[in-house]
Amino acid sequence: MSERCCSRYSSGASIGCTPTSTQAKMVSKRIAQETFDAAVRENIEEFAMGPEEAVKEAVEQFESQGVDLSNIVKTAPKVSADGSQEPTHDILQMLSDLQESVASSRPQEVSAYLTRFCDQCKQDKACRFLAAQKGAYPIIFTAWKLATAGDQGLLLQSLNALSVLTDGQPDLLDAQGLQLLVATLTQNADEADLTCSGIRCVRHACLKHEQNRQDLVKAGVLPLLTGAITHHGHHTDVVREACWALRVMTFDDDIRVPFGHAHNHAKMIVQENKGLKVLIEATKAFLDNPGILSELCGTLSRLAIRNEFCQEVVDLGGLSILVSLLADCNDHQMRDQSGVQELVKQVLSTLRAIAGNDDVKDAIVRAGGTESIVAAMTQHLTSPQVCEQSCAALCFLALRKPDNSRIIVEGGGAVAALQAMKAHPQKAGVQKQACMLIRNLVAHGQAFSKPILDLGAEALIMQARSAHRDCEDVAKAALRDLGCHVELRELWTGQRGNLAP
């Protein structure tokens, strides 16, 4: 772009010039959609550019100033067919048409506009950001209330539009919307499609939004989520969405609050809503569906937060299902092989979670879990995620359990862990978990130190220690317990300034 128009493209700070790297690191600058549109219009009117070229030039200029354009619709506004209005973006024109149809109570038109609204917002997150800025939520909320009179098709379209709009924008859901969402789920519990879309709204509203989580839990959403899995136990989309929403309820991901209620929510799911039983029973309907099994296992692992919950998984038959799933994956027994590696990772994560209970550790070993874990790591050696979770699960099984350590070593667990370290030298997670496993295997006796050292463990651990800062402490602990020389340094002696006499 020519210098004569450069000064017109100011994002606020650093007018007409490219920001330094220090400035870019300090703040990510943003502009309003109107500012971008004005720049595009200037290119068209003053520099005789075509719409596409005008947009491209505007993008290049703003990005050169360090402006974040991720929430900007990067197309030229269009003139309406009759030319009676100012140029506007398609999403805003559609929003205007939708508002008019809702105000006139024309359900068929409303449904058609909602469908088009969803399609546009799915294609570009900037569209839903702009729509939210221009009042999309109250318009969709009004359409939603219009649909509650008994139009199931319009109700589904309204929920779909709400789920798209709140994706990444959970602040949009207000108290009225929250109550209507719970009421809609309650009144339409028998309708799979409505339940699925409503739960998706719950998930989007709760992700990174602690207040929405707490308010929805108080409004009674948890029994609706577990009930959806029970009631629609063969409907893959409903089960998937419900599992995802349950997991989101156990997240602590909102940086705006000092602490969340993730632990309490997990307890409520298990104790008040029989969450573990619901999930374990649901697996029986999807034994040939790795994708849904991954969701169910991933949710189980989020709920195994207390000693008694870990034992409950075993008592409900969950352990035998987990070990069987792992064995089936290792033996290629599943008809659908797509997604098997993800399922293996989730099963391993769940075994790791329930192995926090010492009695469950022994139950896993008795059920043949160690052999299946070692086989999974060997078979999926190219996957750093599987290797990390395998080492972590074995690490938990060996913790405070010398007999389990012997079974792991004799079953090839140490060999597999060292192979994983060789295969993924740049993966800090693999290196860290492998070091912790080796440390636990030899912590209560030196019988396995020499065999493990003979496999080249010392060099691999030293390599992990030098390559990854996160491995420093666990690597030193592993080397120390293996009987290797480790230089232990005092990090602070208290001899600086006036701290020492």
From Swiss-Prot:
Methylated at His-263 by METTL9. It comes from the Eukaryota. The lineage of its organism: Eukaryota, Metazoa, Chordata, Craniata, Vertebrata. InterPro entries: ARM-like, ARM-type_fold, Armadillo. It comes from Homo sapiens. PROSITE patterns: ARM_REPEAT. GO terms for biological process: hematopoietic progenitor cell differentiation. ARM repeats lie at residues 220-264, 274-318, 319-369, 370-412. Belongs to the ARMC6 family. GO terms for cellular component: cytosol. Changing H261 to R/A: Strongly reduced histidine methylation by METTL9. Changing K267R: Does not affect histidine methylation by METTL9. The modification Phosphoserine is found at S64. This is Armadillo repeat-containing protein 6. Pfam families: Arm. Keywords: Methylation, Phosphoprotein, Repeat. Changing A266G: Does not affect histidine methylation by METTL9. The modification Pros-methylhistidine is found at H263.
